[in-house]
Regions:
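Extended, well-ordered alpha-helical scaffold segments
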Residues: 9, 24-32, 79-92, 133-152, ...
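Aromatic-rich carbohydrate-recognition surfaces in CAZymes
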Residues: 61-68, 72-87, 92-179, 204, ...
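The tetratricopeptide repeat
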Residues: 120-123, 210, 263, 267, ...
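Extended glycan-interaction surfaces of carbohydrate-active proteins
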Residues: 14-62, 85-110, 159-198, 231-313, ...
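Generic amphipathic alpha-helical segments used as scaffolds and interaction surfaces in large
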Residues: 19, 74, 218-221
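Extended acidic/polar, glycine-enriched regions
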Residues: 1-8
Length: 395
């Protein structure tokens, strides 16, 4: 196999790696990049003439919020203008409140009762670092200022200053359902006893990345101040001293939910954990998440290896957890997890899957899945270096 020649930016980018990495890795890199390229929606769409990347070319008829952020992470490496289109599509949907909706469907419907985890600013800042564009940067700053105001005004416990997921459902049942969708972890064990009353560990870490992104896009002491204050609150409030683990916490009664998932490791990814807490999390990883990094601990009584967010392995959340461990020096543990997941991906020739069985590694869910492709690329190319904006590890 040799790379194509011509004017295709994906081909040109892939050619840089041909013969310079293990061939099995090159084949996987090629498959991942072409998955993202192949998911570009064809024909006239509600977002035309912008080119939107669907989560999968097989199902998911629309453009999803946090999927798009992860697509930006991938395609910005070889086609920054295509990456910018993903962000522009979502900016067109932004509500007067500042909320960036969950999805726009191909029939024009917009799901705007809730958002998605705020990873778009992080992806936009990485795009800006890879391919600066002053005009696009101004567009991002205006939209993200409004979006940050939305999260601060509508998704915080005012007295404590931490963030929670929520939604605008007309009934308590709708609000509960839609808040789970806003989290992206639709049916997670984390939410079995409620979600709108929980300070979610991943959300608060994503907001730290939001503030770091704003420091790049919109240099202003305000963003660093908010970042550092949020880090302080995460470390003071979301560390369970009894369990020696980061966990979601009920903002009304102060109780931890006791659920261990890859989200528990997000403070390692953002670098806020002390070395002592990171070491405790490494022990948690060995007991609860190795080798397959399921979406809830193998030891959890509600673990279901085929449950959507109740056991299946998702490459995005597994990457954040494993990269956090890697950045803290737990190389053997992190490398073992990475290699397990990449071997599962390699074992299925021809396509990348939405998620994987955490015991057998068999593929589950949609095929040709975009964010799986994006994180395969990160596992291959951004494993031994610091990911942008994850650089403030506590000493």
């Amino acid at each position: 196999m040799t790379p194509f020649s011509g004017n295709n930016p994906c081909d040109a980018w892939l050619s840089k790696f041909y013969g310079k990495m293990p061939f099995e890795d090159y084949l996987l890199l090629d498959r991942a990049a072409r998955t993202l390229e192949g998911n570009v929606a064809r024909g006239n769409k509600p977002w035309s003439p912008l080119r939107g990347i669907r989560p999968s070319c097989v199902i998911f008829p629309g453009i999803w919020n946090w999927d798009s952020a992860f697509h930006v992470l991938g395609v910005s490496r070889w086609n920054p203008e295509l990456a910018r289109d993903q962000i522009r599509i979502l900016f067109r949907l932004q509500q007067p409140s500042g909320l960036i909706p969950d999805v726009i469907f191909e029939d024009g419907r917009i799901m705007n009762r809730y958002g998605k985890p705020p990873v778009l600013p992080w992806a936009a800042a990485i795009l800006e670092q890879r391919s600066p564009d002053p005009e696009f940067r101004e567009l991002c700053v205006a939209a993200f200022r409004r979006n940050e105001t939305f999260w601060r005004n509508n998704r915080t416990g005012k007295k404590i200053g931490l963030f929670h997921y929520d939604a605008d459902g007309e009934t308590p049942e709708e609000r509960f359902r839609d808040a789970k969708y806003e989290s992206g972890w639709d049916n997670s064990v984390r939410w079995d006893n409620g979600i709108s009353n929980l300070f979610a560990i991943d959300l608060n870490c994503y907001m730290v990345l939001f503030y770091r992104a704003m420091r790049i896009l919109d240099p202003n002491p305000l963003w660093e101040s908010r970042e550092q204050e949020l880090i302080r609150r995460i470390e003071e409030t979301l560390w369970n001293e009894t369990d020696q683990c980061y966990e979601d916490r009920n903002m009304e009664n102060g109780e931890f939910n006791g659920v261990i998932t890859p989200a528990s490791f997000m403070p390692l990814f953002i670098g806020s954990a002390s070395p002592e807490r990171a070491a405790a999390m490494a022990e948690i990883a060995e007991k609860h998440e190795m080798p397959g990094w399921p979406s809830v601990s193998y030891q959890n009584p509600n673990f279901d290896p085929e449950g959507y967010w109740r056991g299946r392995t998702w490459l995005n959340i597994a990457y954040f957890a494993l990269k956090g461990l890697k950045n803290y020096g737990f190389d053997s543990l992190a490398d073992q997890g990475r290699n397990t997941l990449l071997n599962w991906v390699r074992a299925v020739p021809g396509f990348l899957c939405e998620n994987y069985h955490p015991v057998s590694g068999k593929p589950i869910g949609a095929v040709h899945f975009g964010w799986s492709a994006a994180f395969v690329i990160e596992f291959l190319l951004n494993w031994n270096s610091e990911l942008p904006m994850a650089e403030t590890r506590q000493k």
